[in-house]
């Protein structure tokens, strides 16, 4: 990477199911585009790939497999997009991502009772985000929505376990806790304030789990 090339920023949204990640990530992408920032919006799992289609059937409870197998598939789904993400960032394009490796650890360790260190190992070496916005809502926040429960992890007791596991990342300096029980506009405004603090300057990549 040349010194005069500004690397794009990598922003991740994390949180429980139905915490507002899709809404807030879309709003941020719109904001960046309106401010002449070239940006790519990604989602994990990406259900369009071969691996992603298997994951999608699992989440919809249309197939079953061992806990270890599904965890490794989630990780593989992230790895198959690493070249794309790296290429975008090197071109100066920002990447906004709905879920990332932190979901893998929180869900597999919290919901499936897999060892936390074991869960982290497959994602070691993935590109580290510049900032993670954790949309913090209570585990029972979305239980009254009409479509709640359609996917395998959408149970309040399961969400409670995942919620506790997410706390392992709260000490990271790039992890920003956002109260997501408020109005959509207020949440978005807080996120924009944090994004404007991100320095855009030449730098090398950092990787998980450094």
From Swiss-Prot:
InterPro entries: P-loop_NTPase, Thymidylate_kin-like_dom, Thymidylate_kin_CS, Thymidylate_kinase. DTMP binds at residues 17, 47, 74, 78, 99, 107. Its EC number is 2.7.4.8, 2.7.4.9. This is Thymidylate kinase. Pathway: Pyrimidine metabolism; dTTP biosynthesis. Belongs to the thymidylate kinase family. Changing residue 74 to A: Loss of thymidylate and guanylate kinase activities. Changing residue 108 to T: No defect in thymidylate kinase activity. 2.1-fold reduction in affinity for dGMP. Changing residue 43 to R/L: No defect in catalytic activity. It comes from the Eukaryota. Catalyzes the phosphorylation of thymidine monophosphate (dTMP) to thymidine diphosphate (dTDP), the immediate precursor for the DNA building block dTTP. Can also phosphorylate dGMP and to a lesser extent GMP, dUMP and dIMP. Can use either ATP or dATP as phosphate donors in presence of Mg(2+). PROSITE patterns: THYMIDYLATE_KINASE. One of its GO terms (biological process) is dTDP biosynthetic process. Transmembrane segments: none annotated. GO terms for cellular component: cytoplasm; mitochondrion; nucleus. The gene is TMK. The lineage of its organism: Eukaryota, Sar, Alveolata, Apicomplexa, Aconoidasida. It comes from Plasmodium falciparum (isolate 3D7).
């Amino acid at each position: 990477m040349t010194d005069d090339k500004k690397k794009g920023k990598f922003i991740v949204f994390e949180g429980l199911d139905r915490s507002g990640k899709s809404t807030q990530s879309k709003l941020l992408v719109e904001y960046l585009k309106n401010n002449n920032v070239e940006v790519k919006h990604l989602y994990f799992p990406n259900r369009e790939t071969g691996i992603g289609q298997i994951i999608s059937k699992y989440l919809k409870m249309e197939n079953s497999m061992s806990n270890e197998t599904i965890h490794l598939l989630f990780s593989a789904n992230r790895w198959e997009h690493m070249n794309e993400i790296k290429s975008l960032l090197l071109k100066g394009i920002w990447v906004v991502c709905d879920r990332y490796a932190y979901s893998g650890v929180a869900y597999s360790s919290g919901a499936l009772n897999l060892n936390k260190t074991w869960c982290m190992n497959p994602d070691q070496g993935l590109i580290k985000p510049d900032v993670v916005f954790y949309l913090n809502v209570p585990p029972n926040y979305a239980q009254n929505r009409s479509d709640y429960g359609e996917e395998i992890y959408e149970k309040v007791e399961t969400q409670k376990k995942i919620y506790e596991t997410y706390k392992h990342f709260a000490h990271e300096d790039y992890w920003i806790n956002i109260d997501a029980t408020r109005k959509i506009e207020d949440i978005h405004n807080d996120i924009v304030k944090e994004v404007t603090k991100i320095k855009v300057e030449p730098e090398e990549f950092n990787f998980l789990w450094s």
